[in-house]
Amino acid sequence: MEILRLAQSKKNIISLNMDLERDMQRIDEANQELLLKIQEKESEVQRLEHEITQTGDPAEDEEWEKENYTVMEREQALQELEEETARLERKNETLVHSISELQRKLTRKSQKIVRCEQGDLERTPEESKVKLQLLESSCADQEKELGKIMEDYVFVSQLCEDQALCIKKYQEALKRIEEELETGYLEREVSKVLSMDSEREKTVSLNEKDGFISNGALRFSKRIFRSLLFSTLFFIRLLGYLIFHLSFINPDLLVNALPKILSRDVLWKLRCFLFPSLTLETEDMLPH
Protein backbone atom coordinates (compact mmCIF):
# COMPACT_ATOMS: atom_id res chain seq x y z
CA MET A 1 0.00 0.00 0.00
CA GLU A 2 2.82 2.39 0.87
CA ILE A 3 4.57 1.52 -2.39
CA LEU A 4 1.45 2.45 -4.37
CA ARG A 5 1.24 5.79 -2.56
CA LEU A 6 4.89 6.50 -3.27
CA ALA A 7 4.47 5.53 -6.92
CA GLN A 8 1.45 7.85 -7.20
CA SER A 9 3.42 10.67 -5.58
CA LYS A 10 6.25 10.02 -8.00
CA LYS A 11 3.87 10.22 -10.96
CA ASN A 12 2.44 13.48 -9.63
CA ILE A 13 5.89 14.95 -9.22
CA ILE A 14 6.88 13.86 -12.74
CA SER A 15 3.74 15.48 -14.20
CA LEU A 16 4.42 18.65 -12.23
CA ASN A 17 7.99 18.66 -13.50
CA MET A 18 6.79 18.33 -17.08
CA ASP A 19 4.29 21.15 -16.56
CA LEU A 20 7.05 23.32 -15.15
CA GLU A 21 9.30 22.56 -18.11
CA ARG A 22 6.52 23.44 -20.55
CA ASP A 23 5.82 26.67 -18.70
CA MET A 24 9.50 27.53 -18.70
CA GLN A 25 9.73 26.87 -22.43
CA ARG A 26 6.67 29.01 -23.08
CA ILE A 27 8.11 31.81 -20.95
CA ASP A 28 11.43 31.59 -22.83
CA GLU A 29 9.65 31.81 -26.19
CA ALA A 30 7.60 34.79 -25.01
CA ASN A 31 10.76 36.50 -23.75
CA GLN A 32 12.53 35.88 -27.07
CA GLU A 33 9.60 37.35 -29.00
CA LEU A 34 9.52 40.31 -26.64
CA LEU A 35 13.25 40.90 -27.09
CA LEU A 36 12.87 40.80 -30.88
CA LYS A 37 10.00 43.27 -30.73
CA ILE A 38 11.98 45.55 -28.43
CA GLN A 39 14.95 45.46 -30.82
CA GLU A 40 12.66 46.28 -33.75
CA LYS A 41 11.11 49.15 -31.80
CA GLU A 42 14.55 50.47 -30.87
CA SER A 43 15.72 50.37 -34.50
CA GLU A 44 12.51 52.10 -35.60
CA VAL A 45 12.91 54.75 -32.92
CA GLN A 46 16.54 55.32 -33.94
CA ARG A 47 15.51 55.65 -37.60
CA LEU A 48 12.77 58.14 -36.77
CA GLU A 49 15.16 60.05 -34.52
CA HIS A 50 17.73 60.24 -37.32
CA GLU A 51 15.12 61.47 -39.82
CA ILE A 52 13.74 64.03 -37.41
CA THR A 53 17.22 65.35 -36.55
CA GLN A 54 17.86 65.82 -40.27
CA THR A 55 14.59 67.68 -40.97
CA GLY A 56 13.25 69.35 -37.85
CA ASP A 57 13.08 72.63 -35.95
CA PRO A 58 14.09 73.20 -32.27
CA ALA A 59 10.52 72.88 -30.97
CA GLU A 60 10.05 69.56 -32.73
CA ASP A 61 13.46 68.41 -31.47
CA GLU A 62 12.45 69.24 -27.90
CA GLU A 63 9.17 67.38 -28.32
CA TRP A 64 11.06 64.46 -29.81
CA GLU A 65 13.46 64.43 -26.86
CA LYS A 66 10.51 64.24 -24.47
CA GLU A 67 9.00 61.36 -26.42
CA ASN A 68 12.38 59.66 -26.58
CA TYR A 69 12.76 60.06 -22.81
CA THR A 70 9.34 58.44 -22.33
CA VAL A 71 10.35 55.58 -24.61
CA MET A 72 13.60 55.15 -22.69
CA GLU A 73 11.68 55.01 -19.42
CA ARG A 74 9.43 52.33 -20.82
CA GLU A 75 12.43 50.42 -22.15
CA GLN A 76 13.99 50.62 -18.68
CA ALA A 77 10.76 49.26 -17.20
CA LEU A 78 10.86 46.45 -19.74
CA GLN A 79 14.45 45.74 -18.76
CA GLU A 80 13.42 45.55 -15.12
CA LEU A 81 10.63 43.22 -16.16
CA GLU A 82 13.16 41.05 -18.01
CA GLU A 83 15.30 40.95 -14.87
CA GLU A 84 12.25 39.86 -12.90
CA THR A 85 11.64 37.19 -15.54
CA ALA A 86 15.24 36.00 -15.20
CA ARG A 87 14.80 35.84 -11.43
CA LEU A 88 11.64 33.77 -11.88
CA GLU A 89 13.47 31.51 -14.30
CA ARG A 90 16.20 30.96 -11.73
CA LYS A 91 13.56 30.18 -9.16
CA ASN A 92 11.94 27.75 -11.57
CA GLU A 93 15.29 26.11 -12.14
CA THR A 94 15.69 25.79 -8.38
CA LEU A 95 12.25 24.20 -8.16
CA VAL A 96 13.08 21.81 -10.99
CA HIS A 97 16.31 20.91 -9.23
CA SER A 98 14.47 20.30 -5.97
CA ILE A 99 11.89 18.19 -7.79
CA SER A 100 14.64 16.12 -9.41
CA GLU A 101 16.29 15.69 -6.01
CA LEU A 102 12.95 14.61 -4.58
CA GLN A 103 12.54 12.14 -7.43
CA ARG A 104 15.95 10.68 -6.71
CA LYS A 105 15.08 10.42 -3.03
CA LEU A 106 11.80 8.71 -3.88
CA THR A 107 13.60 6.32 -6.19
CA ARG A 108 16.13 5.46 -3.53
CA LYS A 109 13.42 5.06 -0.91
CA SER A 110 11.30 2.91 -3.21
CA GLN A 111 14.33 0.71 -3.80
CA LYS A 112 14.87 0.53 -0.06
CA ILE A 113 11.20 -0.35 0.43
CA VAL A 114 11.49 -3.14 -2.12
CA ARG A 115 14.57 -4.44 -0.37
CA CYS A 116 12.83 -4.11 2.97
CA GLU A 117 9.83 -6.02 1.67
CA GLN A 118 12.14 -8.73 0.45
CA GLY A 119 13.75 -8.83 3.89
CA ASP A 120 10.45 -8.59 5.78
CA LEU A 121 9.79 -12.23 5.08
CA GLU A 122 12.76 -13.08 7.31
CA ARG A 123 12.06 -10.39 10.00
CA THR A 124 9.77 -10.44 12.96
CA PRO A 125 6.42 -8.62 12.99
CA GLU A 126 7.74 -6.06 15.52
CA GLU A 127 10.58 -5.06 13.24
CA SER A 128 8.20 -4.84 10.30
CA LYS A 129 5.87 -2.63 12.34
CA VAL A 130 8.72 -0.27 13.30
CA LYS A 131 9.87 -0.14 9.69
CA LEU A 132 6.34 0.62 8.56
CA GLN A 133 6.09 3.52 11.03
CA LEU A 134 9.36 4.91 9.73
CA LEU A 135 8.08 4.63 6.19
CA GLU A 136 4.84 6.40 7.13
CA SER A 137 6.75 9.27 8.75
CA SER A 138 9.00 9.57 5.69
CA CYS A 139 5.92 9.58 3.45
CA ALA A 140 4.39 12.36 5.58
CA ASP A 141 7.59 14.38 5.26
CA GLN A 142 7.60 13.84 1.52
CA GLU A 143 3.96 14.94 1.31
CA LYS A 144 4.86 18.12 3.20
CA GLU A 145 7.73 18.78 0.80
CA LEU A 146 5.41 18.11 -2.11
CA GLY A 147 2.88 20.58 -0.66
CA LYS A 148 5.58 23.24 -0.41
CA ILE A 149 6.62 22.55 -3.99
CA MET A 150 3.00 22.87 -5.13
CA GLU A 151 2.68 26.20 -3.31
CA ASP A 152 5.89 27.42 -4.96
CA TYR A 153 4.59 26.24 -8.32
CA VAL A 154 1.29 28.12 -7.86
CA PHE A 155 3.23 31.24 -6.82
CA VAL A 156 5.50 31.01 -9.86
CA SER A 157 2.51 30.47 -12.16
CA GLN A 158 0.81 33.56 -10.73
CA LEU A 159 3.98 35.58 -11.22
CA CYS A 160 4.23 34.35 -14.81
CA GLU A 161 0.65 35.43 -15.46
CA ASP A 162 1.34 38.84 -13.94
CA GLN A 163 4.46 39.13 -16.02
CA ALA A 164 2.56 38.24 -19.20
CA LEU A 165 -0.05 40.90 -18.35
CA CYS A 166 2.67 43.50 -17.76
CA ILE A 167 4.38 42.57 -21.02
CA LYS A 168 1.09 42.94 -22.87
CA LYS A 169 0.50 46.38 -21.32
CA TYR A 170 3.99 47.56 -22.20
CA GLN A 171 3.59 46.27 -25.75
CA GLU A 172 0.36 48.24 -26.09
CA ALA A 173 2.08 51.33 -24.68
CA LEU A 174 4.99 50.94 -27.11
CA LYS A 175 2.58 50.46 -29.99
CA ARG A 176 0.69 53.61 -29.00
CA ILE A 177 3.93 55.59 -28.72
CA GLU A 178 5.05 54.31 -32.12
CA GLU A 179 1.73 55.34 -33.67
CA GLU A 180 2.04 58.79 -32.10
CA LEU A 181 5.59 59.15 -33.41
CA GLU A 182 4.56 58.04 -36.90
CA THR A 183 1.58 60.42 -36.82
CA GLY A 184 3.81 63.33 -35.78
CA TYR A 185 6.36 62.46 -38.45
CA LEU A 186 3.65 62.26 -41.12
CA GLU A 187 2.19 65.59 -40.00
CA ARG A 188 5.62 67.22 -40.25
CA GLU A 189 6.17 65.73 -43.70
CA VAL A 190 2.73 66.92 -44.87
CA SER A 191 3.37 70.44 -43.55
CA LYS A 192 6.75 70.43 -45.28
CA VAL A 193 5.18 69.34 -48.57
CA LEU A 194 2.45 71.98 -48.22
CA SER A 195 5.04 74.69 -47.56
CA MET A 196 7.05 73.52 -50.57
CA ASP A 197 3.88 73.62 -52.72
CA SER A 198 3.05 77.14 -51.53
CA GLU A 199 6.60 78.30 -52.27
CA ARG A 200 6.44 76.65 -55.69
CA GLU A 201 3.13 78.37 -56.41
CA LYS A 202 4.61 81.72 -55.36
CA THR A 203 7.63 81.24 -57.62
CA VAL A 204 5.38 80.17 -60.52
CA SER A 205 3.16 83.23 -60.06
CA LEU A 206 6.23 85.50 -59.89
CA ASN A 207 7.64 83.89 -63.02
CA GLU A 208 4.33 84.35 -64.78
CA LYS A 209 4.24 88.02 -63.79
CA ASP A 210 7.83 88.52 -64.94
CA GLY A 211 7.07 86.71 -68.18
CA PHE A 212 3.98 88.84 -68.74
CA ILE A 213 5.96 92.04 -68.14
CA SER A 214 8.82 90.91 -70.38
CA ASN A 215 6.38 89.88 -73.12
CA GLY A 216 4.64 93.27 -72.92
CA ALA A 217 7.97 95.11 -73.12
CA LEU A 218 9.04 92.95 -76.06
CA ARG A 219 5.81 93.63 -77.94
CA PHE A 220 6.11 97.38 -77.24
CA SER A 221 9.73 97.47 -78.45
CA LYS A 222 8.77 95.54 -81.58
CA ARG A 223 5.97 98.00 -82.26
CA ILE A 224 8.32 101.00 -81.83
CA PHE A 225 10.97 99.42 -84.06
CA ARG A 226 8.37 98.68 -86.71
CA SER A 227 7.08 102.28 -86.61
CA LEU A 228 10.62 103.68 -86.90
CA LEU A 229 11.41 101.35 -89.78
CA PHE A 230 8.26 102.27 -91.69
CA SER A 231 8.86 106.00 -91.05
CA THR A 232 12.47 105.72 -92.27
CA LEU A 233 11.41 103.86 -95.39
CA PHE A 234 8.67 106.42 -96.02
CA PHE A 235 11.09 109.39 -95.75
CA ILE A 236 13.69 107.60 -97.90
CA ARG A 237 11.03 107.02 -100.53
CA LEU A 238 9.94 110.69 -100.41
CA LEU A 239 13.59 111.77 -100.70
CA GLY A 240 13.98 109.49 -103.71
CA TYR A 241 10.90 111.02 -105.34
CA LEU A 242 12.27 114.52 -104.65
CA ILE A 243 15.69 113.70 -106.12
CA PHE A 244 14.06 112.11 -109.17
CA HIS A 245 11.85 115.19 -109.65
CA LEU A 246 14.77 117.58 -109.31
CA SER A 247 16.98 115.52 -111.60
CA PHE A 248 14.67 114.73 -114.48
CA ILE A 249 11.41 116.67 -114.25
CA ASN A 250 12.05 120.17 -112.89
CA PRO A 251 15.70 120.93 -112.07
CA ASP A 252 14.88 124.61 -111.38
CA LEU A 253 12.36 123.84 -108.66
CA LEU A 254 14.57 125.03 -105.85
CA VAL A 255 15.70 128.11 -107.78
CA ASN A 256 12.10 129.12 -108.38
CA ALA A 257 10.69 128.09 -105.01
CA LEU A 258 13.38 129.28 -102.56
CA PRO A 259 13.01 133.05 -103.31
CA LYS A 260 9.31 132.72 -102.58
CA ILE A 261 9.87 130.96 -99.30
CA LEU A 262 13.06 132.52 -97.88
CA SER A 263 14.04 136.16 -97.42
CA ARG A 264 16.92 137.82 -99.23
CA ASP A 265 19.25 137.72 -96.21
CA VAL A 266 18.71 134.03 -95.81
CA LEU A 267 19.21 133.48 -99.54
CA TRP A 268 22.43 135.50 -99.45
CA LYS A 269 23.78 133.51 -96.51
CA LEU A 270 22.80 130.27 -98.21
CA ARG A 271 24.52 131.39 -101.40
CA CYS A 272 27.69 132.30 -99.52
CA PHE A 273 27.66 128.92 -97.81
CA LEU A 274 26.94 126.84 -100.91
CA PHE A 275 28.71 128.89 -103.59
CA PRO A 276 32.28 127.52 -103.02
CA SER A 277 31.03 123.96 -103.43
CA LEU A 278 28.87 124.72 -106.47
CA THR A 279 31.47 126.67 -108.56
CA LEU A 280 33.76 124.79 -110.90
CA GLU A 281 37.51 125.31 -110.76
CA THR A 282 38.38 125.45 -114.48
CA GLU A 283 41.57 127.44 -114.43
CA ASP A 284 43.72 124.31 -114.56
CA MET A 285 41.58 122.86 -117.33
CA LEU A 286 41.74 125.90 -119.72
CA PRO A 287 44.47 125.90 -122.42
CA HIS A 288 47.38 128.26 -121.89
From Swiss-Prot:
Q: Which UniProt keywords apply?
A: Coiled coil, Endoplasmic reticulum, Membrane, Nucleus, Transmembrane, Transmembrane helix
- Gene Ontology annotations for the cellular component aspect, listed alphabetically: endoplasmic reticulum membrane; membrane; nuclear membrane
Entry comment describing in which tissues the protein is expressed: Testis-specific. Expressed in spermatogenic cells of testis but disappear by the time mature spermatozoa are formed (at protein level).
- What InterPro entries does the annotation carry? SMCO2/5
Q: What is its main location?
A: endoplasmic reticulum
Taking the record's annotation, the residue ranges forming a coiled coil are: 13-105
Source organism, top-level taxon: Eukaryota
- One Pfam family assigned to this protein is TMCO5
> How does the entry describe its membrane topology?
Single-pass membrane protein
Q: Where are the transmembrane segments?
A: 227-249
Where is the protein situated, by its record's location annotation? Endoplasmic reticulum membrane; Nucleus membrane
What name has this protein been given in UniProt?
Transmembrane and coiled-coil domain-containing protein 5A
Q: Which organism is it from?
A: Rattus norvegicus (Rat)
Give the gene name: Tmco5a
